[in-house]
UniProtKB/Swiss-Prot annotation:
Mast cell degranulating peptide. Its mast cell degranulation activity may be related to the activation of G-protein coupled receptors in mast cells as well as interaction with other proteins located in cell endosomal membranes in the mast cells. Belongs to the MCD family. Bombolitin subfamily. The modification Valine amide is found at V17. This is Bombolitin-2.
């Protein structure tokens, strides 16, 4: 789902910070 993709992207970005 798009939501899962978005959450995964956000999680990756947050984890990168």
């Amino acid at each position: 789902s798009k939501i899962t993709d978005i959450l995964a992207k956000l999680g990756k970005v947050l984890a990168h910070v």
